[in-house]
C-alpha cells in the first residue's frame, strides 16, 4: 500500500468516526429496569416496579413507579454491578468511576450514581421522575448493565454527620433493585 493510499484510508476512517459521533448526538437511546423487592440472603423474585430511561443528547430522563415502599424519602442510586443477589448487596457500591465523595445530584463533587431521593406518598405507588446529565446510556458514565438500588431511608446527600454520609448518604438498607437493560 502506497503512502497516499494509507493517508486516504486513515482520512476515510476519521471521517466515518466523526460522522458517527454527530449522528449519536441526535439519537434517542432507551433502557428499562424492572425493579424487584430485595430478598435478604437471596435473589429477588417479586417485581415491584418498572423504570424507563430515555437519553436525548446528554440528558437522561427516568420515568416509572415502584410499589410497596414505606411512606417518606428513600435514597435512589445507581450501583456499580448488575447483580441483584443477597438482598441487592451484590450490586456493590454506588457507581463512582472518578472516586468522588457522595453528594446531591446537583453537586459537582458526587458519585455518578448519586441520584438523590424519591418520595413515597402516604398511599399509593412511588413515582419516579428524575432527569440527570451525569449518567449516560453510552460512554464513560454508561449505566447499562448496572443496578438501580432503592434504600430504606433518606439519602442525606453527603451533608450528614454520620461516617456513612460521605460514602452512601447514610441511606440505610437496600429494599429494592433492578438491572438497567437497553431497549
From Swiss-Prot:
Known catalytic reactions: 2 superoxide + 2 H(+) = H2O2 + O2
Entries under PROSITE patterns matching the protein: SOD_CU_ZN_1, SOD_CU_ZN_2
Species annotation: Haemonchus contortus
Domain of life from the UniProt record: Eukaryota
E.C. designation(s): 1.15.1.1
Keyword Ubl conjugation assigned: no
Keyword check for ATP-binding: no
Note accompanying the cofactor annotation: Binds 1 copper ion per subunit. Binds 1 zinc ion per subunit.
Major subcellular site: secreted
Disulfide bonds: 88-177
Protein's cellular compartments: Secreted, Extracellular space
Annotated signal peptide: 1-32
One Gene Ontology term of the molecular function aspect: copper ion binding
Protein name as annotated: Extracellular superoxide dismutase [Cu-Zn]
PANTHER family assigned to the protein according to its UniProt record, in alphabetical order: SUPEROXIDE DISMUTASE CU-ZN -RELATED
Keywords: Antioxidant, Copper, Disulfide bond, Glycoprotein, Metal-binding, Oxidoreductase, Secreted, Signal, Zinc
Record: residues binding Cu cation: 77, 79, 94, 151
UniProt similarity note: Belongs to the Cu-Zn superoxide dismutase family.
Job of this protein: Destroys radicals which are normally produced within the cells and which are toxic to biological systems.
Cellular component, GO annotation: extracellular region
Enzyme class: oxidoreductase
Pfam family, one: Sod_Cu
Required co-factors: Cu cation; Zn(2+)
Binding site for Zn(2+): 94, 102, 111, 114
Sugar-bearing residue positions: 63
Amino acid at each position: 500500500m502506497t503512502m497516499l493510499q494509507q493517508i486516504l484510508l486513515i482520512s476515510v476512517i476519521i471521517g466515518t468516526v466523526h460522522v458517527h459521533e454527530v449522528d449519536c448526538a441526535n439519537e434517542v437511546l432507551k433502557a428499562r429496569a424492572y425493579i424487584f423487592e430485595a430478598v435478604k440472603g437471596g435473589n429477588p423474585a417479586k417485581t415491584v416496579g418498572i423504570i424507563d430511561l430515555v437519553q436525548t443528547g446528554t440528558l437522561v430522563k427516568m420515568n416509572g413507579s415502584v410499589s410497596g415502599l414505606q411512606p417518606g424519602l428513600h435514597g435512589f442510586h445507581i450501583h456499580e454491578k448488575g447483580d441483584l443477589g443477597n438482598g441487592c448487596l451484590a450490586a456493590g457500591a454506588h457507581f463512582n468511576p472518578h472516586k468522588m465523595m457522595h453528594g446531591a445530584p446537583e453537586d459537582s463533587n458526587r458519585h455518578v450514581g448519586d441520584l438523590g431521593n424519591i418520595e413515597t406518598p402516604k398511599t399509593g405507588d412511588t413515582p419516579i421522575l428524575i432527569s440527570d446529565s451525569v449518567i449516560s446510556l453510552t460512554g464513560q458514565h454508561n449505566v447499562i448493565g448496572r443496578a438501580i438500588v432503592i434504600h430504606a431511608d433518606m439519602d442525606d446527600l453527603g451533608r450528614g454527620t454520620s461516617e456513612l454520609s460521605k460514602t452512601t448518604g447514610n441511606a440505610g438498607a437496600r429494599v429494592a433493585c433492578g438491572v438497567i437493560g437497553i431497549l
